[in-house]
C-alpha cells in the first residue's frame, strides 16, 4: 500500500519544530513507518538550494528567481526522497511543501498564480499531500518567538506586513480546501497543541485505514 503524505505548514515562529517532535512521538507510539523531511531541502542538492533561498545576502533576490529555486529543490526532493518512500508504504512528513509556495511566493510576494499553477502541475503533479496541518499563530506572537532565535534567515527578517500576508494566505488555503488542510491553534499551550495534533493524526489514520 502506498504511504501517506502529510505536510506541516505555518508562518515564522509558529512552532513547527515542536510540532514535528509531537508528530514523531505519535507515529512511533502507533508503530507507523515514516520519514521526516523539509522544504526547501530534503536531499543534498535540495539542501544546497535551500541555502541559496534562505541565506541573508546583500544582493536582493528576484521574486521569480526565488520561486524557481524553490521548485527546483522540490523536483529533486520528490524524485529522490518523497516518491520512493511513499512507494515503499512509508509515511512522509514534510516541514513545508506546496502550500508554502502559494503563500510565500504567491500571496505574500504577489506572484503570478497562473505561473504557480503551471509549476505545481509540472513538478508536483499528483504528488500533493494527503493532509496538511497548518500551525496558526498571530503574527505578533510569531515575531516574538523569532527574535529569540540565535540565527534568523532571510524570511525571518521580512516585514510585519509580509508575515501578516503569510498568515492570511495559510488561513485562505485552509478555507479553500478544508478536507485536506486542518488548522492547529498554535498560540495555545504546548499540551493543547500536542492534543490538537494527536487528534488530527488519529482522525486521519482512522480515515485512511479503509485504504488497506
Swiss-Prot record:
Coiled coil (residue ranges): none
This protein's GO CC annotations: cytosol
A Pfam family matched in the record: Thymidylate_kin
UniProt keyword list: ATP-binding, Kinase, Nucleotide biosynthesis, Nucleotide-binding, Transferase
A single BP term in Gene Ontology: dUDP biosynthetic process
Reaction catalysed by this enzyme: dTMP + ATP = dTDP + ADP
Binding residues for ATP: 10-17
Database matches in InterPro entries: P-loop_NTPase, Thymidylate_kin-like_dom, Thymidylate_kin_CS, Thymidylate_kinase
Gene3D superfamilies: P-loop containing nucleotide triphosphate hydrolases
A GO molecular function held by the record: ATP binding
EC number of the protein: 2.7.4.9
Top-level division of the source organism's lineage: Bacteria
Similarity comment text for this entry: Belongs to the thymidylate kinase family.
Function according to Swiss-Prot or TrEMBL: Phosphorylation of dTMP to form dTDP in both de novo and salvage pathways of dTTP synthesis.
Name of the protein: Thymidylate kinase
Organism: Marinomonas sp. (strain MWYL1)
Lineage: Bacteria, Pseudomonadati, Pseudomonadota, Gammaproteobacteria, Oceanospirillales
Amino acid at each position: 500500500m502506498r504511504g501517506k503524505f502529510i505536510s506541516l505548514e505555518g508562518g515564522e515562529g509558529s512552532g513547527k519544530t515542536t510540532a514535528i517532535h509531537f508528530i514523531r512521538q505519535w507515529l512511533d507510539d502507533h508503530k507507523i513507518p515514516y520519514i521526516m523531511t523539509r522544504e526547501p531541502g530534503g536531499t543534498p542538492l535540495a539542501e544546497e538550494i535551500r541555502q541559496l533561498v534562505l541565506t541573508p545576502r546583500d544582493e536582493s533576490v528576484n521574486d521569480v528567481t526565488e520561486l524557481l529555486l524553490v521548485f527546483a529543490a522540490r523536483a529533486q526532493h520528490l524524485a529522490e526522497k518523497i516518491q520512493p518512500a511513499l512507494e515503499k508504504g512509508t509515511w512522509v512528513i514534510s516541514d513545508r511543501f506546496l502550500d508554502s509556495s502559494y503563500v510565500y511566493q504567491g500571496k505574500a510576494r504577489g506572484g503570478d498564480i497562473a505561473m504557480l499553477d503551471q509549476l505545481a502541475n509540472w513538478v508536483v503533479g499528483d504528488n500533493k499531500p494527503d493532509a496538511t496541518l497548518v500551525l496558526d499563530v498571530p503574527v505578533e506572537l510569531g515575531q516574538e518567538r523569532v527574535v529569540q532565535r540565535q540565527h534568523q534567515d532571510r524570511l525571518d527578517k521580512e516585514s510585519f506586513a509580509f508575515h501578516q500576508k503569510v498568515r492570511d494566505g495559510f488561513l485562505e488555503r485552509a478555507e479553500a480546501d478544508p478536507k485536506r488542510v486542518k488548522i492547529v491553534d498554535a498560540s495555545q499551550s504546548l499540551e493543547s497543541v500536542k492534543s490538537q495534533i494527536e487528534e488530527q493524526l488519529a482522525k486521519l489514520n482512522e480515515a485512511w485505514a479503509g485504504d488497506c
